[in-house]
Design a protein with these regions (language model features):
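Peripheral interaction segments used for macromolecular assembly
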Residues: 1-175
Length: 175
């Protein structure tokens, strides 16, 4: 499954399944955080709607993500309301439909990362749409995430520092 792309717009309509496969909610958004300048933004988790509440589901708690839905590794679910933190970006609200030059972001492709560190999802590609005055349908192109760096750039100096420290080992941060 490494290298296989899954699109955020598709993920945002999937069911949230417990460890037994029973639906407990629906995914609404994908939360990403910027990495260092050379590393792709990684998926921190998902915002789901369950029992009329918007909750956060950490990406590390998701066992599988496929057409059936996002299946959790365990049975327990944290029903505390979701509140975005400094440096986090929601793909549906903060990235999709943003203008990049004369194009608009129509979707974001995610890829499973298995590089020896903690496996997880990361942003791989961005799908851009351009409307032409003479055509009814837009033209699309798929570009690497680093060709549109302003979409995922940290918004504040504190967010940039948090992105730098996020992948470091705790003993390196303390020292």
């Amino acid at each position: 499954m490494a290298g296989e792309l899954i699109y955020a717009f598709r993920v945002m309509r999937l069911s949230l399944l417990d460890a037994g496969g029973a639906p407990i909610g629906r995914l609404e958004d994908v939360v990403v955080v910027s990495g260092r300048t050379s590393s792709a933004p990684r998926v921190l988790g998902f915002v789901a709607n369950s029992q009329r509440r918007r909750i956060f589901v950490n990406a590390n708690r998701v066992a599988s993500l496929d057409n059936a839905g996002a299946r959790l590794k365990s049975w327990d679910v944290d029903f505390h309301p979701f509140k975005p933190k400094e440096g986090e970006r929601l793909l549906k609200i903060g990235v999709i439909n943003q203008k990049v030059g004369d194009e608009v972001v129509s979707d974001v492709a995610l890829r499973l990362r298995e590089d020896g560190r903690t496996p997880g999802w990361e942003v791989s590609k961005v799908r851009l749409a351009r409307r032409n005055a003479l055509r009814r349908r837009p033209t699309y192109r798929l570009v690497d995430w680093d060709t549109v760096p302003t979409l995922f750039a940290p918004t504040t100096e504190m967010a940039a520092e948090a992105a730098r420290l996020r992948d470091m080992h705790p003993s390196d941060v303390a020292g």
